[in-house]
Amino acid sequence: MIENLLREEIKGFKNYEVENVPYKYKMDANETPFELPEEVMKNIGDIVKSIHVNIYPDPTAEKLREELARYCSVTPKNIFVGNGSDEIIHLIMLAFVDKGDTVLYPHPSFAMYSIYSKIAGANEIAVNLNEDYTYNVERFAEAVERYKPKLVFLCNPNNPTGSVIDEEDIIRIIEKARGIVIVDEAYFEFYGKTLVPYIDRFENLIVLRTLSKAFGIAGLRVGYALSNGEIVKYLNLVKSPYNLNSLSQRIALEVLKSGVLKERVNYIINEREKLVKELNKINGIKVYPSHANFVLCKFENANDVHKRLVERGILVRNFSNVKGLEGTLRITVSSSDANDYLINALREILS
């Protein structure tokens, strides 16, 4: 009986599943190999003691927004914070998408664009990438003109392919769009190019960011959006009053101030280049160029490779049964030890 009461959009949904097996190295979720910065860890007791857990968190996350504004060279009024960028995608849908509106996004790309579109009852248009997983800008621009979507998502760098779309091409799409264009820059720090300087020039632009990847606090769920003051105001209308807890706000603030980002990002970029170079030497692997902290690889029998990696204690993300990603595994760039262990394991498996 209860199933009959479900909204039609929810019927047939499946839970988001995470592999729950013992592991030596976790390289499946694009997480950083680094723990909290040493100075933050040293002060963690004082940080926790300073938080009054009986009092609700600051609903505006004022201090965190001020620090994020400094980091991004914008003003606090341009910043909206959320419980991970996933929540912000959902809030954008709540604020702007009516049932039957069109949401357009690349395919393959981040799964949450489709999931939240379905929940909103939107009409989904998935624009295929090229066979090599690069953006087909002409195809994308034509789709924006043809379908006149309420929302357009561009993941840059794209997850899970690692491919990017040039700034001038994004601007072209923004100028064609009648709706809002969301540029998801979750992996910005590993790429270095951003649309943030354009948030006041284009009233229909939102840039999404996260502290889960380069800043390494995925477990605290802190994401943020950058846009003009009007869009930020509308997002505040639909968020829950206390959507970001006190501990997340405080530790995020300390991590932003810690000054370790550049060193850690450079480490991951260097490891990424080493990983790509070594993977390309192994017969049976097609490696796609990446501008993020992961590498997408294609195998003749990805399911078997995945199984044998798990047997060796290595978790990678298996996309081989996903339409458009057949035969692929996504590998998170991790510590030097983890990357070397993975390379040696793949040499053994594919020998």
Curated annotation (Swiss-Prot):
Pfam families: Aminotran_1_2. The modification N6-(pyridoxal phosphate)lysine is found at residue 213. InterPro entries: Aminotrans_II_pyridoxalP_BS, Aminotransferase_I/II_large, HisP_aminotrans, PyrdxlP-dep_Trfase, PyrdxlP-dep_Trfase_major, PyrdxlP-dep_Trfase_small. Its cofactor is pyridoxal 5'-phosphate. One of its GO terms (biological process) is L-histidine biosynthetic process. It catalyses: L-histidinol phosphate + 2-oxoglutarate = 3-(imidazol-4-yl)-2-oxopropyl phosphate + L-glutamate; L-histidine + 2-oxoglutarate = 3-(imidazol-5-yl)pyruvate + L-glutamate. It comes from the Bacteria. Keywords: Amino-acid biosynthesis, Aminotransferase, Histidine biosynthesis, Pyridoxal phosphate, Transferase. It is an enzyme of class 2 (transferase). GO terms for molecular function: histidinol-phosphate transaminase activity; L-histidine:2-oxoglutarate aminotransferase activity; pyridoxal phosphate binding. Its EC number is 2.6.1.9, 2.6.1.38. The keyword DNA repair does not apply. Pathway: Amino-acid biosynthesis; L-histidine biosynthesis; L-histidine from 5-phospho-alpha-D-ribose 1-diphosphate: step 7/9. The keyword Protein biosynthesis does not apply. CDD domains: AAT_like. HAMAP family: HisC_aminotrans_2 (MF_01023). Homodimer. Belongs to the class-II pyridoxal-phosphate-dependent aminotransferase family. Histidinol-phosphate aminotransferase subfamily. This is Histidinol-phosphate aminotransferase. It comes from Caldanaerobacter subterraneus subsp. tengcongensis (strain DSM 15242 / JCM 11007 / NBRC 100824 / MB4) (Thermoanaerobacter tengcongensis).
